[in-house]
Amino acid sequence: MDFLIIVSTLLLSYILIWVLGVGKPKNLPPGPTRLPIIGNLHLLGALPHQSLAKLAKIHGPIMSLQLGQITTLVISSATAAEEVLKKQDLAFSTRNVPDAVRAYNHERHSISFLHVCTEWRTLRRIVSSNIFSNSSLEAKQHLRSKKVEELIAYCRKAALSNENVHIGRAAFRTSLNLLSNTIFSKDLTDPYEDSGKEFREVITNIMVDSAKTNLVDVFPVLKKIDPQGIKRGMARHFSKVLGIFDQLIEERMRTGRFEQGDVLDVCLKMMQDNPNEFNHTNIKALFLDLFVAGTDTTSITIEWAMTELLRKPHIMSKAKEELEKVIGKGSIVKEDDVLRLPYLSCIVKEVLRLHPPSPLLLPRKVVTQVELSGYTIPAGTLVFVNAWAIGRDPTVWDDSLEFKPQRFLESRLDVRGHDFDLIPFGAGRRICPGIPLATRMVPIMLGSLLNNFDWKIDTKVPYDVLDMTEKNGTTISKAKPLCVVPIPLN
């Protein structure tokens, strides 16, 4: 049935494209030969960031493709990324909006997908000043420590019964509850039991459906049909999670007291002071963006880090030695400790270099024709920046495919968008606003897992847990989850 749907929709698209007489724009960057109807869709493969990196080695760091009806630009070098994300930032600042995101008109109020406008600037200001500012993060430091302690307690419980820990899932639940406490001052899910399972699952389902290849996105003529039902499915997920947010907002408003000091309080006060600029819809859209974008990044990075360290025991041993020397074996890593743990920080940077959570940064869309390095980029062009390829560029990185944290010991490179050789969170005005939280959470979670346990492979798991195969999605996780047994150090 799926095959028949795909074939029929492609044939319909071909007829419409032929009737409309869509031709190839002039003076595009080089790229592979296109096929009728599908263009270069067949070249994307199961892991597009890897396929695009291979194509860039043939056609160059500024490459054009035709994905169905959509002219596409792929950026695969630090120099080209700097041109797009910094020097011509405004020309490339508009987000491409996937059809599924248009469910409930989410793109009209989303900090991730709004074009640069007054509403977008207001949302960025709220996020930067009240969630991810240094003062806000310092005030919630005790909360992050508590959530890490809960993670370590869970691992200790697993150790008592010699059970394995699904590292990615445990880190995901920790991140989810941290965010819910930051926004609502309460857990929305029990981290390791079934209570609150619905909320956890609906957030996961949104991420899963966001990652599905949607024919509508490459053949917009099919928009009204939604042949795969992806937008309809997303609407169901949005309805559930927005309903939960409605209940929490109404519960707080009934009290008439905004004394928690959390993000919800800040938003409700803004709504009271500026009802024409900020309303219920804005609040719920902001919360949805925060949960979808803010839970996966940390957990995926932790899972890749633990996998790399288990594959390189000498690097894990060196990290453990540093932790024992600086804070003492068996201690929880605090945020203030991280500055005294340079090797741990190098490990985090190296993981983000090799395994950026979103290897293809959220795509941009060119609104008006622009010139780039002598090429003409027409209006409507989709723009991908391949952070995965940039982080593995052999002209920039020695032994570019090797996990070598020591490369950062004498380097001042950071991940905050200033150095275009390393942009796991993007750069420019569209840079991920959650960097300050991610760069605090990852080292304290990873360091605490290393400093409290040794880890062994669970022979009962029916696959190689150290397999490095990637699983495609909006973020890139391991295809085979890391499930390992903790052994307490004291």
Curated annotation (Swiss-Prot):
Q: Which Gene3D superfamilies does the entry mention?
A: Cytochrome P450 (1.10.630.10)
This protein is called 7-ethoxycoumarin O-deethylase
Ribosomal protein in keyword set: no
What the entry lists under CDD domains is as follows: CYP76-like (cd11073)
Q: What is an example of a GO molecular function annotated in this UniProt entry?
A: iron ion binding
Query: What EC number(s) does the entry state?
Result: 1.14.-.-
Could you say which residues bind heme here?
Answer: 432
PANTHER family given in the database record: CYTOCHROME P450, FAMILY 76, SUBFAMILY C, POLYPEPTIDE 5-RELATED (PTHR47950), GERANIOL 8-HYDROXYLASE-LIKE (PTHR47950:SF4)
- Keywords annotated in UniProt: Heme, Iron, Metal-binding, Monooxygenase, Oxidoreductase
Keyword match Oxidoreductase: yes
Q: Which gene encodes it?
A: CYP76B1
Q: What does this protein do?
A: Capable of dealkylating a model xenobiotic compound, 7-ethoxycoumarin. Metabolizes with high efficiency a wide range of xenobiotics, including alkoxycoumarins, alkoxyresorufins, and several herbicides of the class of phenylureas. Catalyzes the double N-dealkylation (oxidative N-demethylation) of phenylureas such as chlortoluron and isoproturon with turnover rates comparable to those reported for physiological substrates and produces non-phytotoxic compounds. Could be used for control of herbicide tolerance and selectivity, as well as soil and groundwater bioremediation.
State the organism named in the record: Helianthus tuberosus
Classify the source by domain of life.
Eukaryota
